[in-house]
């Protein structure tokens, strides 16, 4: 059934297809229909960051930037849902076209640029949802906020989403916001993490609950740089790391239509790069901090590979677009079969 739907959706432009799919998933969620359209994965509860996940396969940020279809995605069988990236103020993102499909490579290139309706709109959508499972909210900075003031935007978002999120993801790795990736390195990273940790402690006292903080990193760092990030996360008391965002590399898509478009590459071509980053993190963290793996999962066995590399949870994005809801169950089954 999804194969037919995909054929129809892929006749539309990628962004129109994305928006229509989100509308349909959201409507199905409100009507309680999505669970009837696909077989739910087996229950496989896991505890990570002190949170109980229905299963270890989640929706990655970026598909539902404004929280428009939380219930719909949950009904498809995801063990957790991450929405965003959201910024303090609404912003339109980069000019269109800004999403490109590369079906021969099971890949997508996007240069969306954190287009979203702002954090207040997202929180209204969260309040309207019925979902009681684990909800991650991914936060970023506005395009026109200077990178040296980025911490202000992250703190504004953290203050607002804290009471409504199961965990909060700090996105410092999108390649589509100029200067953002510089926050992954050296003193810039340590200062940002220290400020977030301090605010997390203050908000814990105010709200009477500690909401975990995860940092989402890029796949394009050297092993040495990845190790430095891991050490900074431990030093500042972060709760998890998400590996990885999209890549600037074009390995695997050279010569393909749209292969030279600017933006972040996701899907099958980023798989090995992302899994390598997970392995480097796992070796350095040695179980002291959980890893959420995302990047290139297009079959169930790829999810199992991420867990074998050292991840505790996985997330889907491009693979979900190409394979549909069946990939959720396939991924849960593959992880369960690891024993």
Swiss-Prot record:
Membrane protein topology class: Peripheral membrane protein
SUPFAM superfamilies attached to this UniProt entry: FMN-linked oxidoreductases
Which cofactor(s) are needed, names only? Answer: FMN
Gene that this sequence comes from = pyrD
- Pathway in which the depicted protein is active: Pyrimidine metabolism; UMP biosynthesis via de novo pathway; orotate from (S)-dihydroorotate (quinone route): step 1/1
Q: How are cofactors bound according to the entry's free-text note? A: Binds 1 FMN per subunit.
For the protein in the UniProt heading, the enzyme class is oxidoreductase
What is the name attached to this protein's record? Dihydroorotate dehydrogenase (quinone)
- Write out the entry's keywords from A to Z: Cell membrane, Flavoprotein, FMN, Membrane, Oxidoreductase, Pyrimidine biosynthesis
The reaction(s) this protein catalyses:
(S)-dihydroorotate + a quinone = orotate + a quinol
Positions bound to substrate = 65, 110-114, 171, 176, 245-246
| GO BP | 'de novo' pyrimidine nucleobase biosynthetic process; 'de novo' UMP biosynthetic process
Source species: Pseudomonas fluorescens (strain ATCC BAA-477 / NRRL B-23932 / Pf-5)
InterPro entries from the UniProt entry = Aldolase_TIM (IPR013785), DHO_dehydrogenase (IPR050074), Dihydroorotate_DH_1_2 (IPR012135), Dihydroorotate_DH_2 (IPR005719), Dihydroorotate_DH_cat (IPR005720), Dihydroorotate_DH_CS (IPR001295)
């Amino acid at each position: 059934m999804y194969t037919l739907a995909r054929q129809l959706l892929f006749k539309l432009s990628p962004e129109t297809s994305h928006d229509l799919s989100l509308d349909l998933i959201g409507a199905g969620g409100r009507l309680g229909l999505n669970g009837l359209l696909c077989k739910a994965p087996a229950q496989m509860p896991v505890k990570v960051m002190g949170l109980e996940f229905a299963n270890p396969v989640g929706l990655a940020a970026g598909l539902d930037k404004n929280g428009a279809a939380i219930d719909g995605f949950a009904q498809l069988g995801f063990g957790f849902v991450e929405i965003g990236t959201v910024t303090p103020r609404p912003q339109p993102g980069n000019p269109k076209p800004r999403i490109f499909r590369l079906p021969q490579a099971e890949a997508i290139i996007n240069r969306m640029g954190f287009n979203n309706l702002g954090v207040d709109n997202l929180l209204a959508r969260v309040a309207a949802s019925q979902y009681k499972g684990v909800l991650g909210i991914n936060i970023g900075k506005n395009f026109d906020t200077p990178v040296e003031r980025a911490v202000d935007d992250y703190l504004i978002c953290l203050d607002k989403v804290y009471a409504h999120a199961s965990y909060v993801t700090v996105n410092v790795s999108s390649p589509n916001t100029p200067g953002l990736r510089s926050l992954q390195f050296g003193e810039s990273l340590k200062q940002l993490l220290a400020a977030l940790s301090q605010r997390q402690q203050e908000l814990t006292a105010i709200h009477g609950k500690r909401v975990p903080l995860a940092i989402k990193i890029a796949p394009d760092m050297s092993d040495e740089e990845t190790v430095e990030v891991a050490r900074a996360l431990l030093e500042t008391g972060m709760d998890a790391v998400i590996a990885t965002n999209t890549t600037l590399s074009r390995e695997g898509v050279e010569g393909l239509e749209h292969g030279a478009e600017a933006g972040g590459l996701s899907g099958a071509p980023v798989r090995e790069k992302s899994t390598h980053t997970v392995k480097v993190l796992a070796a350095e963290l040695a179980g002291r901090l959980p890893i959420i793996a995302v990047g290139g999962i297009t079959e169930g066995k790829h999810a199992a590979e991420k867990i074998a590399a050292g991840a505790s949870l996985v997330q889907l994005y491009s693979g979900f677009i190409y394979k549909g809801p069946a990939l959720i169950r396939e991924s849960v089954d593959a992880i369960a079969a690891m024993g």
